Design a protein with these regions (language model features):
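C-terminal substrate-binding/catalytic lobe of Rossmann-fold NAD(P)-dependent oxidoreductases
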Residues: 70-188
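Rossmann-fold NAD(P)-binding glycine/threonine-rich loop
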Residues: 3, 11-35
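Gly/Ser/Thr-rich loops at beta-strand to alpha-helix junctions
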Residues: 14-17, 38-47, 68-71
């Protein structure tokens, strides 16, 4: 679309942003159009939070926790799997990791240590549930780096319990100030 229109895009597959930027940038420049990418929740608003916190605490470390909430992009990725009728995917911060960050200890955390993912899936009648679950749990850039739980539910349960789209998260920066780096700070 960047070759035909001015575009505002909330593309959020973090691992593929450089590739997406290159493609959109080339098309927009060639057509004389303007394109703004990665301007949603994260990247986007959370990126501004990280920028602000880095200005205040230039010596430190950033941590981003998403959720608890529905990821529309991840839910859509699951809905594209053969045999899936509907899905809501929740990203959930690991409380132990959040507490470690808030302590100011600057822990090194893997993706798996920071978040879990939980999927509520309505499958088509006769679908191979084991195959669907495996495809979800091994999907690169979405689930393979996380502990993921898959629940198969019926449509009525989806409508009753998972029709909303709650979302949230937090950006935390921990760092030090002072001539001897003697003061620990946390910005949240």
């Amino acid at each position: 679309y960047a070759s035909m229109y001015n575009v505002v895009d909330s593309f959020d597959t973090h691992a593929r942003i450089p590739e997406h930027f290159a493609a959109v940038d080339a098309a927009a420049k060639k057509a004389g159009k303007v394109s703004l990418i990665s301007c949603g929740w994260d990247p986007g608003m959370f990126s501004l939070n990280r920028l602000y916190a880095n200005c205040v605490l230039p010596e430190g470390k950033d941590y981003t926790f998403w959720g608890k909430g529905v990821s529309q992009g991840h839910s859509d990725a699951v809905r594209r799997i053969e045999g899936v009728k509907d899905c809501r995917q929740y990203t959930i911060p690991v409380e132990k990791a959040v507490e470690a960050v808030r302590s100011g200890s600057n822990p090194e955390l893997t993706t798996r240590e920071k978040h879990t993912r939980e999927c509520f899936v309505v499958a088509e009648e006769g679908a191979d549930l084991a195959k669907i679950e495996n495809e979800i749990k091994t999907m690169p850039n979405y689930f393979s780096d996380y502990d993921t739980t898959v629940h198969f539910i019926i449509e009525e349960e989806m409508k009753r319990d998972h029709s909303g789209l709650p979302h949230g998260g937090m950006v935390i920066r921990t760092g030090v100030t002072g001539m001897e780096k003697e003061h620990k700070h946390v910005i949240e």
